[in-house]
Amino acid sequence: LIVEGNLKEENQQFTNAGIQTHTESLKDSIAYFTKNLEIDVANPSSDPKVFENIKNLEEYDGLIWGGSSLNIYNDTIEIRRQIEFMKESQKKIKKILAICWGMQVAVTAAGGEVRKCQKGTHRGIAHQIQINDNGLKHPLYKNKKNNFNTPAFNFDEVSKIPDNAILLSSNKINKVQGLNFKINECDVWGIQSVSYTHL
């Protein structure tokens, strides 16, 4: 299952400009590795009946939740729908890869906190992401240099990680660049960068 973080109206603007949506980009990234997957897409913000329009969440092997231009602290009805959908996903799907906005939603749903960046923003590239000792042991960063740059675009950051979460990487702007936590029976991997090459 892929969850689209942007509103339907914003995705239409991307399409009109000839730019891929986050979901389309994720599908291309996955297709690079395998085409032997059945992929469904959900958009909790723009689909009030999202639970009726997809399979039972227990049937999915995993979930990838991508980026968005939304700010979670704005607490709109569309954002609340995403948080609620994430909470249900964390109860019923065993593996979640949460990217950028997706990580912020996953953290919030699990009791963590997100705020505006305090030390600057990423506008194109996140520089000098340092993988810590926990990250070097984690499969998320397998064969990755322990200090790297990657595409990123974010104005917000995780300020409090969920209980029992493990910090995997940081840089000067965002202390939380990568993390891992388990909630219910779900294993959540989160990265702040918008680069989908981690897949």
Question: In which residue ranges do the predicted regions lie?
Answer:
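Short glycine-rich His-centered loop
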Residues: 2-17
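Short catalytic helix/loop segments, enriched in acidic residues and glycine
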Residues: 16-31
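A short beta-strand-loop structural module common to alpha/beta enzyme folds
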Residues: 37-46
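Cysteine-nucleophile active-site neighborhood
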Residues: 68-135
